[in-house]
Amino acid sequence: MKAFHFLRIAAVVTLLYFAGHTAGMPWTPYTDPEALAIIEAMKNHSFEAEGLKGTYWDFYFGFGIIISLFLFVQAAVLWQVASLARTDAIRVRPIIVSFLIAFIINAALAWKYFFAVPVVMSGVIALCLAISLVLASRSQTALRGASTDKPGPAGS
């Protein structure tokens, strides 16, 4: 398999991460009476921030939607980067590194603050990105070897 294959896998897993995160909306446990009381307090306590009046619930819910949007965009960009990697894997390495760092941090934060599903999703994505980075680097080594091969005169 080549770098672009693992980038495509990372894109699909990121899309699944987006779908799971979005399906979990509104991202709260509704079974615990104490949790319900906290959620109600979040919805009822309003304050002003940067000239806008809102609640903690507005921030919580809004950030959840923003995260879903960014996961969707990341999936789309990874798919596009995979297309670029098909013909020029070397040049997409800095992009792969950026996403790799982001998903490693995502996995660490999910481990600390959330639960297993986002940890596993981020970990699988990071693994695919790491493998694609190694494979992209190998394609550069192969190109270097090919560029040093000089054709000799005919018949030699």
Give a label for each model feature.
Residues H5-T31:
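N-terminal signal-anchor transmembrane alpha helix
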Residues V13-L16, F63-L69, I95-S98, M121-V124:
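Physicochemical signature of membrane-embedded alpha-helices that form the seven-helix bundle of GPCRs
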